[in-house]
């Protein structure tokens, strides 16, 4: 099984990277082939909203990393989307990627309803927030990022098999044993 991890955290040793590392190790120990893409290192131009991709099925802008990542998503059996919460949402770098590859994630029916193009692929969503638990949930911080990623993944046809959220990352810079266990469990659900 091929698993693609989209890591949208700019922090190489932060909580998201640690969580992704645990999931990667668990998936590989269960026979999966895992590739991690660090979204913050991608060279992607912003979408210009020309809407040509909706009728042509490809982006007319010059090729950049967005097309290469889309090909990896299409080849993968499962995807982990991991992002810290920025202002109750996903980071701009991840949103930029999703904006540019919308044509490969979903189409439209003849009456304009979304038509998923990635049906059958499994997905795990991961988010962190500096807002301490349980306020990160009550104030819709990390949950806001999960909500935004969930909307994109659902319209694309992914079956979301798990979500993992962690609050209070400003003070809790390392994963607890319980958090590592949740990450391993999510990785196993991705493979089953």
Each language-model region and where it sits:
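A short beta-strand-loop structural module common to alpha/beta enzyme folds
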Residues: 33-43
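Glycine-rich phosphate/pyrophosphate-binding loop and the adjoining helix
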Residues: 8, 30, 139, 143-192
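Helix-loop-strand module that forms the ligand-binding subsite of alpha/beta enzymes
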Residues: 62-150
């Amino acid at each position: 099984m091929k698993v693609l991890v989209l890591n949208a955290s700019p922090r190489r040793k932060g909580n998201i990277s640690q969580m992704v590392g645990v999931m990667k190790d668990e998936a590989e120990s269960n026979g999966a082939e895992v590739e991690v893409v660090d979204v913050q290192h991608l060279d992607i131009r912003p979408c210009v909203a020309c809407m040509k991709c909706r009728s042509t099925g490809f982006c007319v802008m010059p090729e950049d990393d967005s097309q290469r990542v889309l090909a990896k998503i299409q080849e993968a059996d499962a995807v982990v989307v991991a992002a810290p919460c920025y202002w109750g949402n996903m980071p701009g770098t991840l949103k930029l990627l999703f904006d540019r590859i919308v044509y490969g994630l979903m189409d439209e029916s003849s009456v304009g309803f979304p038509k998923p193009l990635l049906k059958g692929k499994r997905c795990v969503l991961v988010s962190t927030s500096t807002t301490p638990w349980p306020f990160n949930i009550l104030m819709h911080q990390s949950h806001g990022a999960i909500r935004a990623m969930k909307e994109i993944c659902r319209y694309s046809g992914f079956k979301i098999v798990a979500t993992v959220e962690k609050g209070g990352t400003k003070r809790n810079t390392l994963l607890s044993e319980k958090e590592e266990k949740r990450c391993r469990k999510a990785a196993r659900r991705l493979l089953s």
